[in-house]
From Swiss-Prot:
Belongs to the isocitrate and isopropylmalate dehydrogenases family. LeuB type 1 subfamily. The keyword Magnesium applies. Pathway: Amino-acid biosynthesis; L-leucine biosynthesis; L-leucine from 3-methyl-2-oxobutanoate: step 3/4. It comes from the Bacteria. It comes from Acinetobacter baylyi (strain ATCC 33305 / BD413 / ADP1). This is 3-isopropylmalate dehydrogenase.
Amino acid sequence: MSKQILILAGDGIGPEIVGAAEQVLTKVNEKFELGLTWEHGLLGGSAIDAHGEPYPAVTSEQAKKADAILLGAVGGPKWDTIERSIRPERGLLKIRSELNLFANLRPALLYPQLADASSLKPEIVAGLDILIVRELTGGIYFGQPRGIRELENGEKQGYNTDVYSESEIKRIAKVAFELAALRGSKVCSVDKANVLEVTELWKQTVTELQQAQYPNIQLSHMYVDNAAMQLVRAPKQFDVIVTGNLFGDILSDEAAMLTGSIGMLPSASLDENGKGMYEPCHGSAPDIAGQNVANPLATILSVAMMLRYTFREEAAAKAIEDAVGQVLDQGLRTADIMSEGMQRVGTVEMGQAVVAALA
């Protein structure tokens, strides 16, 4: 198979964290003789500066050719005042939509070395390992009609449309069930079926699919408000959570903080054939850009997810995850996960330490 990667560093801390991750990618590519090749492109603010738009045609062509994309982060205050339709975040929505990256996988995994970094008591989060499967190309973020209009009385009104078809729900539920079969065989589908018809259909469709094709997977349903509470109250009850775009966006960020730092969490966005875009869960953090303080581990772990889900190189993926564990065992910490008695290091040093652990 082709093994072509497109690297999009993006904005803010993107170039720094991607730089560290690229060193790790180079190391595993050599060590495991993976035969991967890659090129660089522009997305978001950097693309606006160079081409006047967040997702230019040249990047689109590169993305279509690639088997996997490694992204840093997009956005920053520099572009907050330009027209909404060409802001950096629009580039991210466009690439997801164009490549049909409908399945977003967000693990919330607590490294034992970082148990004290969580805001919850250690006994509540110890051993935490949740996978949130979020539908990424439908729902209220993409539904039409949408906009801001003026009513007859002169008052402005904002409106959006939350819409899901049966086929969209089925394909994301299928991903969740397939992944659950490799884990704890437990899926919790999150909806608001008591109020929203769109999630009433969601609940019904997920249930029918489970009964027809995945009878060995334990399925439960939870309203989103309760799910948000349960994630804080007793997070270890969850294994795989599947939900729509809006709910998934919110719950995955909440779950991220159970682990102590969003700087530790990778994500994958996949199409139906395993092509994917891999990126850290955190944003572009322009306030710390260029200071060599950002945590590159989420981006490095995104490389591990890429090797696992797109290239099916499990040994190489596991080697990266083990190397991250070794570095944490050595007491190395970036500022966001720093605790008493540990050694504070910068972005570059953390990346180099992971490379050394892979030797």
